[in-house]
UniProtKB/Swiss-Prot annotation:
Recorded metabolic or biological pathway in which this protein acts: Carbohydrate metabolism; pentose and glucuronate interconversion
Family assignment from sequence similarity: Belongs to the mannonate dehydratase family.
Regions crossing the membrane: none
Coiled-coil region: none
Catalytic activity of the protein: D-mannonate = 2-dehydro-3-deoxy-D-gluconate + H2O
Name of the protein in question: Mannonate dehydratase
InterPro entries assigned: Man_deHydtase, Xyl_isomerase-like_sf
Gene from which this protein is expressed: uxuA
The EC number(s) this enzyme carries: 4.2.1.8
């Protein structure tokens, strides 16, 4: 696997020099300063590429080129946004960056309720609390119809949870959910947030699939002409939330996506932490079945909690519910399969969402993206990969 690291650009508190010391050789990056929907010019791409390469690193993957909300709903100026997206892909490919991660999650990117969940060892992790999220939906946002998404027991627990919250806690929970986590390009007020949700009224899972298929059908000719691979990131968490459909959550979703848009340029990001939240997702089976379409991997683990099967926190990379041993083995099998047919390019892998720990506890960091926790995760995965290669792979 190619060892990569997500870098949020020149303002990231984790520098490129830090990343080199962590042992990564590839950078996962995006031009976050360019508004959603606008074309990334070659000038801006090359400027960022030069900054990365000056440190002896490679811009391996774009994460992400954001998909404008009007593309997802096929409303307003959606065709102009698609045309802009196509031009951005052309520009990236012509500048030598040929793998693009993206997602098709409506309104929100990845979602957590607690950004400082304390682990038994004193480090801090990210957490999604089903009851806290229900309290937000039912009593803070007051989304019409939200009751249908929760059991009676969950509704009662959510009311008790809300009644025990202080004003500061209400503000913090609201901010955690709607203000935008790292990598998300949009943040909202409560009123703006509800207005965005309302735009999806009448858009079912099947309808959103149609919109995604149209979007990809427009992009594939550009991707095929330039050898640029798209790698869709799964929904996080991988289930419907806020009354919104989610369409990249299960192996059945991947089956549909690859059959509907069969171009080899229509690929996948295997994010084990996202898919792994669902107990019915067999990650190794997913990799074995769709390995040829995996162009990027995020390796992390989550732990479903006993209090509620929908509640989870981010575990250490080799702990939790993800069988990292067999996941890495399956990825290495796919790399070997490719090498046997002449494709020796390694699959980019980044250690995702490390715990905030040690000296980073005293620093301001991007949630999930502190340096030391990811350094630990990368070292653990690197060691696992090396041991597996020495034991089982001789070619």
């Amino acid at each position: 696997m190619e060892q990569t690291w997500r870098w949020y650009g020149p303002n990231d508190p984790v520098s490129l020099d830090d990343i080199r010391q962590a042992g990564a050789t590839g950078i996962v990056n995006a031009l976050h300063h360019i508004p959603n929907g606008e074309v990334w010019s070659k000038e801006e791409i090359l400027k960022r590429k030069a900054i990365i390469e000056e440190k002896g690193l490679t811009w391996s993957v774009v994460e992400s080129v954001p998909v404008h909300e009007e593309i997802k709903t096929l409303t307003g100026n959606f065709q102009q946004w698609i045309d802009n997206y196509k031009q951005t892909l052309r520009n990236l490919a012509e500048c030598g960056v040929d793998t693009v991660c993206y997602n098709f999650m409506p309104v929100l990117d990845w979602t957590r309720t607690d950004l400082e969940f304390e682990m038994p060892d004193g480090s801090k992790a990210l957490r999604f609390d089903q009851i806290a999220f229900a309290a937000f939906e039912l009593h803070i946002l007051k989304r019409p119809g939200a009751e249908a998404d929760y059991t009676e027991a969950e509704q009662a627990q959510a009311l008790e949870y809300f009644n025990n919250m202080t004003a500061d806690q209400i503000q913090q929970l609201t901010s955690n959910i709607i203000a935008g986590l790292p990598g998300a390009e949009e943040g909202y007020t409560l009123e703006e947030f509800q207005a965005q949700l309302d735009r999806y009224a009448g858009i079912s899972k099947d309808k959103l699939r149609e919109h995604m298929a149209y979007f990809l059908s427009q992009l594939m000719p550009v991707c095929e002409a330039h050898g640029l691979k798209l790698a869709v990131h799964p929904d996080d968490p991988p289930r419907p939330i806020l009354g919104l459909p989610r369409i990249v959550s299960t192996i059945e979703d991947i089956d549909w996506l690859t059959e509907k848009v069969p171009s080899k340029m229509n690929g996948l990001t295997m994010c084990t932490g996202s898919y792994g939240v669902r107990g019915d997702n067999d990650l190794v089976k997913m990799i074995k079945k769709h390995g040829e379409r995996i162009y990027f991997t995020h390796l992390r683990s989550t732990k479903r909690e006993e209090s509620n099967p929908m509640t989870f926190h981010e575990a250490a990379h080799l702990d939790g519910d993800v069988d990292m041993y067999n996941v890495v083995m399956a990825i290495l099998d796919e790399e070997q399969r490719r090498a046997e047919v002449g494709d020796h390019r390694l699959i980019p892998m980044r250690p995702d969402h490390g715990h905030q720990m040690l000296d980073d506890l005293k620093k301001k960091t991007n949630p999930g993206y502190s340096a030391i926790g990811r350094l630990k995760g990368l070292a653990e995965v690197r060691g696992l990969e090396m041991a597996l290669k020495r034991a089982f792979y001789t070619k």
